[in-house]
Amino acid sequence: MAQSTYVPDRVGVVGLGLMGGSFAKAEHEGGREVYAWNRTHATVELAEIETIDGELTDDVIPTCELIILAGYPQVSIDWLQRMAGLISPGAIVIDAVGVKRVICEKCFAIAEGHDWTFVGCHPMAGTQYSGFAHSRANMFHGAPMVVVPPKMDDFDRASVLERLKHLLEPCGFGSFTLATAAFHDEQIAYTSQLAHVVSNAYVKSPAAQSHKGFSAGSYKDLTRVARLNAPMWRELFLDNADNLSREIGTLIGNLQQYKDAIDARDGQRLEALLAEGDRLKKEAERR
C-alpha cells in the first residue's frame, strides 16, 4: 500500500442534507475536523458558520481518513468515480444511502483499483423532513447502523470495522449490524420503503382533507412519513423495485382479504384476520 496522506480522524462529508448534515454536526461536536461538499454551495457556506471547518476541495480530500457519501445514490456514485484517485491510501469511504445493491456493486468496483476501502452503510434513523436545516447532531444516538463490508479476510474485515466504529463514535450509534447488500434491500423494502408508500397513498383519500377533530394517534402514526422528499424516494424505490413491488403485492393481497370479509359481512372471517395480525405482530416483537 502506498503512503497514506490522511490526517487521523479528519472527516469529509459529501452532501449536506438531513443525513450528511447530521453526520457533520455529530462529528464536529465530537471534536473532529469536518469538511463538506454540497451541490448547492450556499449550504456549505451556511455549514461553515458553526458546523464544518471548510469545503471538501480537491486539496482536502486526500487529508480525510473517513469520507461519508450522503447524497442521492447516483450523485454519491458519480462523486466517488470522479474523486477516487484523490482519496488517501488507507482511508475509509462509506455511504449513507437507503439501498445497498446498486451503490455497493458500483462503489466496490471503484474501490478495487485503489488502496482505500469502501464499506456500504445505512444509518437506521431519520425524520419525515429533509435538508440541512432539519439535521441534528443527535440524529443517530442509539440507532442501528447496517454495515455491508467488502470481500476480505476475517482479520482485515475486523480491523476495518473497528476503525469505522472509532471514526463514527461521535455519532453515538447503538449497534452495528453486518448484512449482505441483497438481504439489506429485501428487509428495507418492507421495514422502510413499503411504510412510505402506504403512508403516501393513505393520505390520498378525500377524507384526509377533513380529518381534524376526528383523528388521533393512529392517524398521526400512519401518516407521518407521507411527507417525503419525492425525488430522493423515487430513486430509492426504483433502485429496489423488485423487492418493493413484491411487498406491495403482498400487502394488496392481505388488504383484499379484509375487504372481502367486510363486503360479505363475514364477522367470523374478519375476526380471524384481525387475530392473525395481532398474533404475528406479537411474534415479531419477541424475536
Region locations from a protein language model:
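NAD(P)+-binding Rossmann beta1-loop-alpha1 motif at the extreme N-terminus of oxidoreductases
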Residues: A2-P62
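Phosphate-coordination loops involved in phosphoryl transfer and adenosine-cofactor binding
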Residues: V7-R10, G90, G142
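N-terminal Rossmann-like NAD(P) cofactor-binding module of classical short-chain dehydrogenase/reductase
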Residues: I67-I68, I94
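Glycine-rich, N-terminal phosphate-binding loop of Rossmann-like dinucleotide-binding domains
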Residues: A70-Y72, V97, P149
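Rossmann-like NAD(P)(H) cofactor-binding subdomain of soluble oxidoreductases
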Residues: Q81-H134
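Internal alpha-helical scaffold of NAD(P)-dependent oxidoreductase catalytic cores
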Residues: A137-R224
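Interdomain hinge/lid region at the active-site interface
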Residues: S210-L280
